[in-house]
């Protein structure tokens, strides 16, 4: 009898994607984050589904419905904490996954990379609309500040902002539609993730050396299934430690107060995973300029393949590029820290310098480093 997994139309797809898939023999732990992101997405959809059963998207009852989930629903506190901290784990994995792609030159798989950038934007949109739902002070004011940025767009800005709000300010209509968006977007993310994998499987995985691995492939199962299982166990361990021991450490204390349009919190700031972009936005004194810089900070990833000047794909054997890469990582951590600080000196100047360095590194210094390394590798005799 021929093996069912190789003949059945549905099983065949699963088989070619997760079982008999030829994979490079040398991919490191940095290649675990793709599967971890898949795990995060499933955790978020499941916990979100159970939260949606008890949540009400109305300005009068949203805050108390979240309190009701935590107090009266069986394990509601756990479901909510897993969902809130699951978002942080999701972004942690996302940033490491993108960092891996930059370090090892995975962006040269252009279709996979571009779908990945679209995925990043979709996940950011989902997290943003989700943060509004508990209807706490930071939910309300964070949404007000960020959606207000649309009004910086010339001519159509104000109309656009009011269209998104469903009125003249963030209110009941905004909350209801954001709940609808927050419910539908994860399924769009799931579909995009499948397209992401489809494009990846057209070329096969990259590997740490950046050299074509076709001559030395191993089956995905059991080697990488067990490796992914280990990664998922560690992810779950960290998530449970967060959710059970310090569930509120990554949140904002202001969000324990119900939304009040008449009282502005002293420091309006988004969740930690948006702080780097928020710092770039704030570093430009002009509203429209800030919005453009904010967009550029993410969309710059799309031109990454065009900025690749090195003859080698990976940074594994390129010490100059490696140094710049880790400076970029440190710069992003600096931006994240600055984004959470009040708008005063010395944070303003640090934020402006870090923002300049971010664009300088990606657009000029890293391409120059690639050219320099090419020159250094040329025989000089």
Swiss-Prot record:
Entry-linked SUPFAM superfamilies: a domain/subunit of cytochrome bc1 complex (Ubiquinol-cytochrome c reductase) (SSF81648), Transmembrane di-heme cytochromes (SSF81342)
Signal peptide bounds: none
Alphabetical list of InterPro entries matching this protein: Cyt_b/b6_C (IPR005798), Cyt_b/b6_C_sf (IPR036150), Cyt_b/b6_N (IPR005797), Cytb/b6-like_sf (IPR027387), Cytochrome_b (IPR030689), Cytochrome_b_C_euk/bac (IPR048260), Cytochrome_b_N_euk/bac (IPR048259), Di-haem_cyt_TM (IPR016174)
Positions of transmembrane segments: 33-53, 77-98, 113-133, 178-198, 226-246, 288-308, 320-340, 347-367
Binding annotation for heme b b562: 83, 182
Binding sites annotated in the UniProt record for a ubiquinone: 201
Miscellaneous comment as given in the Swiss-Prot or TrEMBL entry: Heme 1 (or BL or b562) is low-potential and absorbs at about 562 nm, and heme 2 (or BH or b566) is high-potential and absorbs at about 566 nm.
Role, per record: Component of the ubiquinol-cytochrome c reductase complex (complex III or cytochrome b-c1 complex) that is part of the mitochondrial respiratory chain. The b-c1 complex mediates electron transfer from ubiquinol to cytochrome c. Contributes to the generation of a proton gradient across the mitochondrial membrane that is then used for ATP synthesis.
Subunit relationships: The cytochrome bc1 complex contains 11 subunits: 3 respiratory subunits (MT-CYB, CYC1 and UQCRFS1), 2 core proteins (UQCRC1 and UQCRC2) and 6 low-molecular weight proteins (UQCRH/QCR6, UQCRB/QCR7, UQCRQ/QCR8, UQCR10/QCR9, UQCR11/QCR10 and a cleavage product of UQCRFS1). This cytochrome bc1 complex then forms a dimer.
Full protein name: Cytochrome b
Species annotation: Murexia naso (Long-nosed marsupial mouse)
Gene: MT-CYB
């Amino acid at each position: 009898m021929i093996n069912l997994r190789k003949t059945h139309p549905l099983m065949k797809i699963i088989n070619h994607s997760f079982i008999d898939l030829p994979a490079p023999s040398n991919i490191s732990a940095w290649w675990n984050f793709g599967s971890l992101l898949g795990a995060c997405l499933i955790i978020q959809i499941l916990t979100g589904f159970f939260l949606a059963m008890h949540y009400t998207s109305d300005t009068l009852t949203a805050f108390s419905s979240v309190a009701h989930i935590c107090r009266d629903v069986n394990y509601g506190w756990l479901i909510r904490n897993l969902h809130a901290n699951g978002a942080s784990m999701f972004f942690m994995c996302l940033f490491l996954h993108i960092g891996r792609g930059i370090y090892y030159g995975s962006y040269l798989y252009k279709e996979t990379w571009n779908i990945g950038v679209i995925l990043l934007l979709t996940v950011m949109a989902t997290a943003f609309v989700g943060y509004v739902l508990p209807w706490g002070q930071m939910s309300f004011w964070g949404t007000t500040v960020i959606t207000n940025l649309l009004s910086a767009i010339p001519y159509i800005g104000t109309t656009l902002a009011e269209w998104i709000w469903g009125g003249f300010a963030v209110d009941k209509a905004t909350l209801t539609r954001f709940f609808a968006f927050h419910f539908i977007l994860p399924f769009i993310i799931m579909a995009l993730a499948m397209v992401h994998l489809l494009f990846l499987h057209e070329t096969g995985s990259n590997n740490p050396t950046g050299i074509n691995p076709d001559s030395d492939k191993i089956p995905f199962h059991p080697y990488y299934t067990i490796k992914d299982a280990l990664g998922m166990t560690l992810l779950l361990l960290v998530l449970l430690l967060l959710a059970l021991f310090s569930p509120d450490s990554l949140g904002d204390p202001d969000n324990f107060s119900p939304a009040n349009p008449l009282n502005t919190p002293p420091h309006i700031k988004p969740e930690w995973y948006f702080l780097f972009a928020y710092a770039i936005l704030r570093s430009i004194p002009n509203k429209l300029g800030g919005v453009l810089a904010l967009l550029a900070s993410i969309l710059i990833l799309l031109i990454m393949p065009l900025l690749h000047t090195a003859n080698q794909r990976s940074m594994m054997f390129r010490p100059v590029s490696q140094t710049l890469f880790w400076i970029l990582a440190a710069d992003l951590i600096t931006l994240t820290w600055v984004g959470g600080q009040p708008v005063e000196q010395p944070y303003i100047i640090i934020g402006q310098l870090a923002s300049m360095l971010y664009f300088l590194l990606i657009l000029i210094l890293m391409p120059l480093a690639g050219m320099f390394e090419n020159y250094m590798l040329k025989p000089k005799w």
